């Protein structure tokens, strides 16, 4: 026999999984998280910018040689993924952490790079990318730049500019 006081608990237990599912889908899919992000940024422009999109730029090696680079950034309210491609390698995200330090937006980015030549070993790298122009003008494209360091004991500079807000674009060179 079910007591009258147990009925609200039973209702809560039958509704709670659906509420959790809706919340998870809302914060993890671009379909819902990007409009929420746009609204929140409209209400408070100092919030972290939406980095979703296609990016182009260059990687400057420690010897000064510049290599063209393209990237796609996919970001939702929970995580960010950066796929960075050059003619000689492609880098996949191991970890990203967006932060705001002293009013400056940054993204801590750790990646594994796979060279196009299968005889070359893969390597990992890390960089702190500064996010620029996010609060200056809405018409100015966002820019990312920072120094990188790899476990091969190499270093250099990454510089990217957002060319589109589309994330379903192929940026691979090979």
Feature locations, PLM:
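Central antiparallel beta-sheet cores of small beta-barrel/beta-sandwich binding domains
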Residues: 38-174
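N-terminal alpha-helical membrane-insertion module
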Residues: 1-46
